[in-house]
């Protein structure tokens, strides 16, 4: 299992314009601090488990509107932001790992986690060995970082660029309105 942070302003660090130009305007939504966290996991047989999406704040109306069938959505306290903590990890284990990994897979499975302090040694799923990657080594060892997450982020960036190009709604400060959670979930 690995968490990825999806920033809602995926502004590129490169621009294209005439050489020597001192100011290049960039269209953005001024939402640099707005982000969601998605926990992804693949079973030992290569099957993708349901994603676990963390939004900050409350969202009871959002869940009623969307009714996502292939996704588990949780809302976190504002102080936590949309980061995984021990309680949310326990919910992930119960709602996704224990529910989706059948008994045959569990007897032979290990759960590989990055060395995240918020979940370290706090809770582990039933019938599963949990191993933590050494600190600062996940970019070399974590299978999800090396494959699935990179592809997911790349596809989201393409979607975001298309959305920004076609979105003409602006705020009173003349910024493009940021992508809402409904748009994000429907696309995902």
What are these regions (language model features)?
Residues 1-188:
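RecA-like helicase/translocase P-loop NTPase motor core
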């Amino acid at each position: 299992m690995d968490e990825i942070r999806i920033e809602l302003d995926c502004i590129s660090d490169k621009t294209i314009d005439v050489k020597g130009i001192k100011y290049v305007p960039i269209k953005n939504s001024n939402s640099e601090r707005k982000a969601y966290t998605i926990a992804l996991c693949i079973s030992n047989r290569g099957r993708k488990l349901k994603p676990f999406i963390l939004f900050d704040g409350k969202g009871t109306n959002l869940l009623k509107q969307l009714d996502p069938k292939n996704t588990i959505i949780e809302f976190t306290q504002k102080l936590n932001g949309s980061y995984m903590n021990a309680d949310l990890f326990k919910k992930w284990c119960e709602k996704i790992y224990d529910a989706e990994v059948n008994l045959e897979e569990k007897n032979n499975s290990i759960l590989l986690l990055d060395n995240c302090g918020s979940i370290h040694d706090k809770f582990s799923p039933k019938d599963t060995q949990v191993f933590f990657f050494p600190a600062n080594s996940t970019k070399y060892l974590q299978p999800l970082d090396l494959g699935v997450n990179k592809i997911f982020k790349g596809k989201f960036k393409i979607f975001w660029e298309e959305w920004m190009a076609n979105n003409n709604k602006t705020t009173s400060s003349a910024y493009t309105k940021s992508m809402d959670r409904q748009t994000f979930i429907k696309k995902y």
